[in-house]
Amino acid sequence: MEIDRPMSGGRSLVTVVDRIADRLNAQPKCGLMVGIDGVDGVGKTTFADDLGDALRARGREVIRSSADGFHNPRSVRYHLGRLSPEGFYRHSYNYPLLQRVLLQPLTAQGSRRFRFAAFDHATDRPIEAEEQIASDEAILIFDGLFLHRPELRGYWDFTVFLDAPFEVTIPRGASRGPGFGDPDPAATSNRRYIEGNRLYLDECKPRQVASVVIDHSDLTRSNIVTWND
């Protein structure tokens, strides 16, 4: 995918989203798989929703899904302990399930029969979601943690890594309401998430391999840091 280098300087989030949507929409009318990556609280879901809306406004069919629908059961997620950074990084998500019911069906050789989600982490139960059929032109917009892990990296045609320091993302994530954690980055309960994300950043180096890296520290003024694709 040939994409010109971005201009320097911050831009509004709408401008950045539109820039990416224009590049994706300019590709041949075949299915694309797009991953929106970043640490907890950086703003992945909102960015992915906005990108999906921008593509729909350009006449594209969008499949919108998230890693939140593919957690492992609690017994797997916490088997190294509820505060384990290693457990958070290694065991939060069921990658074979994600591959089987969503990613593999949407590849060029896939059946196009997929499910948006397969597990409800709030109830700790599988979701009996109805199978859907994607058109050949549908674009998958998928947000979640750890999307540049080896298990997933080969599926994406284009990725965005939203970057911001933990001093910003931890209180931002906590501001979503009760149940979203302590706003203090130094709180013991946040060590699991911060250190788990650091394991991912060190092992998979998403800043170096993502198609686009965006400084998302200021939600009103996003800056395209690198355009690697």
Please tell me what each predicted stretch does.
Residues 44:
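Conserved lysine of the Walker
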Residues 125-179:
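ATP-dependent NMP and nucleoside kinases share a basic, alpha-helical "lid"
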Residues 63, 72-123:
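Conserved nucleotide-sensing/catalytic segment adjacent to the nucleotide-binding pocket
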Residues 1-27, 154, 158, 167, ...:
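NTP-dependent small-molecule kinase module
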Residues 53-63:
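Post-Walker A helix-loop "phosphate-sensing" segment adjacent to the P-loop in P-loop NTPases
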Residues 40:
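The conserved Walker
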Residues 47:
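Hydrophobic positions on the alpha1 helix immediately C-terminal to the Walker A/P-loop
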